[in-house]
Amino acid sequence: MIELNKKHYEYEGSIPDYFEKVVLEENNLEPPGKKSLGDAYLDERTAVDVKTINVNGDFHMGNLASQDKIRKWLEDKQNSLMFFFIEYEEDCGVVAINSTKLKHIEEIHPDCLQISAQGLGVMQLKNWDKVEFISKMNRDEWFKDVYAPLLKEFISKEEKKLEKLRLVYDSYKD
């Protein structure tokens, strides 16, 4: 279990970076390597990524992680990926914690996820304000019913963009 010890924090620098450090320190967790999927590990098989949400902010669509990293990590059924969501309000260098939630990726409602065009695709929350959680899905079901359809939709969009780009390229040939 991951928790925050206080309701208010004075911070310096970026709030997401600050809370990644706070979560590690307050829960006696070791930082992972630079290329790791999560910001912390509960054990060698449970990656936890810290996600901060400013409830007074205008933009609430958060990147979760590269879809490729997620797939590679979760293909090993012994591995788990969790997100520690921290909802907060900020005022003059002080952050007030509204709520925290520790959830497996398989607990995020499928309608709340998308894969967007960054690199090989990044899995995102469509809108934190409308995110819903469900009972944890079986891993095989999650891959079949959530991941595969999202990836298919992403690939289709990318193919359409590339086809338009190909037409531009073809107009300059010859």
Predicted segments, located by residue:
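Nucleic-acid endonuclease domains
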Residues: M1-D174
